[in-house]
Swiss-Prot record:
Protein family according to the UniProt entry: Belongs to the dGTPase family. Type 2 subfamily.
InterPro entries registered for this protein in UniProt: dGTPase (IPR006261), dGTPase-like (IPR050135), dNTPase_2 (IPR023023), HD/PDEase_dom (IPR003607), HD_domain (IPR006674), PHydrolase_assoc_dom (IPR026875)
PANTHER family with a match to the protein in the record: DEOXYGUANOSINETRIPHOSPHATE TRIPHOSPHOHYDROLASE-LIKE PROTEIN 2 (PTHR11373:SF40), DEOXYNUCLEOSIDE TRIPHOSPHATE TRIPHOSPHOHYDROLASE (PTHR11373)
Keyword Acyltransferase (UniProt): no
Keyword Hydrolase in annotation: yes
Leader sequence residues: none
Organism annotation: Shewanella sediminis (strain HAW-EB3)
Protein known as: Deoxyguanosinetriphosphate triphosphohydrolase-like protein
Molecular-function GO terms, alphabetical: dGTPase activity
Organism phylogeny: Bacteria, Pseudomonadati, Pseudomonadota, Gammaproteobacteria, Alteromonadales
Length: 444
């Protein structure tokens, strides 16, 4: 592993700041934490709609919790497998990845993502992870053209799906809808990968890899007829971040649902406890199956203790796994969850999906956001030089003049909006009784 290559940035920096002894990844963490894109996560949907309740988690609080879990995974791996400690760099690297992992997600969660993907169906598609990569490498104005100008290893770590859109896309056979209100998200699932517009940056990130490692890292698997292809591999750092994200999603979104009365003890018993009693792991059978009483307790401290038990159970069940087909240690080794705990985590994720995400009230909010995003896109696409903000107009005009993908500029603008801003902008454009646009001008 050539450390100096992984520390490289696309734009060489010669900043001389007095007594600045920070590591490269401490600098990356600071850039992410202080970015406008990160701050906007405070007003973007996690699972429950922004404004439904003061307790719920937003994308921002979710990202902070993912960072906490990610550093916990890193710390316990250091203790459990000290022989692999040299593979990990600064703790700030894991923090950076966890804080940044959701930066590209559009307003209104999955509804906004599907909406933008549909509107971009002939222009390279849209997907939140691809947009995260795009923000970090080009859009966030820390530099003029290179985004946050993060280290190569940080960018490698953010690549959950490391392959270009065009190599993964498979036509579904679905025809465009006659009316956008008829759009079914299941028919327009986004490709999980990097936009072709950014494939040159992906090439730069992967430069230190040898030919066989690169080819295997970019390879994909078939998920079945009419489904997009899916990448198979990720880096060591990314594997830690993804596990932290999965644990936070399953456990903390479950907590939101319990507190807000969306799920009941009987549903827990039927869909979770009954399945976990069949686990091959004695600890899961004993602890997880009997935790329901505390999870649903009206005593706050008992519920928090139960949540902590769940998180700790998953974090301490993570170990290092090896894939000897790779040469580079950053690809050869990944963090992996014990099989029994992986199955238990999947049970929790499916429980949240069934009783929370698929709940009609949540789906109505998602559907409304879907319509808002598509109607905004239609409006801006109809006359970009009239309706887009001045700075975005300039980007659109430059892209259009150079024969580049000018539709991507519109997707960039809308995906950067918060839920509230998108809703108010939609009101100003389409509601005759809405007030002046002036108060919106300085927000994005």
């Amino acid at each position: 592993m050539t450390e100096s290559l992984w520390h490289e940035r696309r734009l060489t920096e010669e900043k001389k700041r007095r007594n600045d002894h920070r590591s490269p990844y401490q600098r990356d963490r600071a850039r992410i934490l202080h970015s406008a894109a990160f701050r906007r996560l405070q007003a973007k949907t996690q699972v429950l709609g922004v404004g439904m309740n003061d307790f719920y988690r937003t994308r921002l609080t979710h990202s902070l919790e993912v960072s906490q879990i990610g550093t916990g995974i890193r710390a316990q791996l250091k203790q459990k497998r000290p022989e692999f400690d040299h593979l990990f760099d600064s703790m700030s690297l894991i923090e950076s990845l966890c804080l940044a992992h959701d930066i590209g997600h559009p307003p209104f969660g999955h509804g906004g993502e599907v909406a933008l993907n549909y509107m971009m169906r002939d222009h390279g598609g849209f997907e939140g992870n691809g947009q995260t990569f795009r923000i970090l490498t080009g859009l966030e104005p820390y530099t003029e053209y290179y985004g946050m100008n993060l280290c190569r290893r940080t960018l490698l770590g953010i690549l959950k799906y490391p392959a270009p859109y065009s190599s993964l896309y498979r036509a579904s056979g679905n025809k465009p809808v006659n009316n956008i209100r008829q759009l079914k998200p299941s028919q327009w699932t986004p490709v999980k990968g990097i936009f072709d517009d950014d494939s040159g940056i992906l090439d730069w990130v992967l430069e230190p890899l040898n030919g066989s490692d690169r080819e295997r890292f970019l390879s994909h698997r078939d998920l079945g007829a009419n489904k997009h292809l899916r990448t198979q591999f990720k880096s060591l750092d990314c594997s830690v971040m993804e596990l932290a994200d999965d644990i936070a999603y399953a456990v903390h979104d479950l907590e939101d649902a319990i507190v807000m009365g969306i799920v009941t003890p009987s549903q827990w018993q039927q869909d979770v406890a009954s399945k976990l009693t069949l686990s091959h792991d004695a600890w899961i059978k004993e602890e997880f199956t009997n935790i329901g009483q505390n999870l649903f307790s009206h005593q706050h401290h008992l519920r928090k203790d139960a949540i902590g038990t769940l998180v700790n159970g998953f974090v301490t069940a993570i170990d290092i796994v090896e894939d000897r087909a790779f040469t580079d240690p950053l690809l050869r080794f990944n963090a992996g969850l014990d099989t029994s705990f992986s199955e238990a985590l999947e049970v929790l994720k499916q429980f949240v999906y069934k009783y929370v995400i698929r709940k009609p009230e949540i789906q109505m909010l998602e559907y409304k956001g879907q319509q808002i995003v598509m109607e905004l896109f239609e409006a801006f696409e109809s006359d970009p030089e009239r309706l887009l903000p001045t700075h975005t107009q300039e980007r659109w005009r430059e892209s259009h003049t150079k024969g580049l993908n000018s539709h991507r500029v519109i997707a960039d603008y809308i995906s950067g909006m918060t839920d509230e801003f998108a809703a108010r902008l939609h009101q100003h454009l389409f509601n005759p009784k809405a007030g002046s646009m002036i108060e919106l001008n300085g927000e994005l």
